[in-house]
Amino acid sequence: MTNQRKPKKALSVADVLSYKPKTIPFEGKWRDAIGLPELKGSWLIYGDSGMGKTSFAMQLGRYLCSINESLWFRTAYDSIEEGLSSSIQEAYKRTGMANVARRFLLLDKESIEDLQIRLKERRSPDVIFIDSVQYAELTRKTYKELVDMFGAKLFIFISHADGDKPKGALAQSIYYDANVCIYVHGFVANVTKSRYGGSGEIVVSESKRQEFWSIKQ
């Protein structure tokens, strides 16, 4: 006789009310746009190439590494699509990554399988950017398995766009599952979805924003 799978324990009212989420204490423009997010689950950043998507992701990563003097999160950026390159180097320089050198790691085209091994180690990153959805070789099933396997970590996926929507079935599935979704267009990051109370936008580069929108007009 095969062993029957037992359901997970149902949570009581007391269990729910006593839950203590591990929140990221965003401040300023980050709190206004996103709210007070938890260190868990997934986010999605999406947009066309050349619109400021990578620059915004780097700005967010740097902020997570230096929220205040006493609080920061180890962050890794898995550049599966591009890897170490001159454009990544320039993004580092623009963002001032030298100031958070010990807290921010670039993973050079690291596979999801190798990433899982890394995340099982002690003192592994708290936040992981995966760039991009289209090159990660994930399915909906393996995406969920990855996020659920490391329930105390935050995964931020980066995706190409098809118009103003994430490109492809997996990216669209992540959009519906993610706690925060951000569409980057014309060097403005628009928060299209947040389960943490935030709403609004963050300008990635004021000079490039003005240049882009002046041409559009």
Tell me what each language-model feature is:
Residues 148-217:
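Phosphate-binding/switch region of NTP-binding enzymes
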Residues 103-158:
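Phosphate-binding/switch loop-helix module in NTP-utilizing enzymes
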Residues 52-56, 136-143, 166-167:
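Active-site-adjacent loop/helix micro-motif of nuclease/hydrolase catalytic cores
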Residues 39-113:
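Conserved P-loop
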Residues 36-37, 64-70, 95-99, 119-123, ...:
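Conserved catalytic network of the ASCE P-loop NTPase/AAA+ motor domain
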Residues 87-91, 142-145, 173-177:
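Alpha-helical scaffold elements adjacent to nucleotide-binding pockets in ATP/GTP-utilizing enzyme cores
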Residues 21-37:
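Pre-Walker A adenine-sensing motif
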Residues 1-20:
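Charged, amphipathic alpha-helical linker segments immediately N-terminal to NTP-binding catalytic cores
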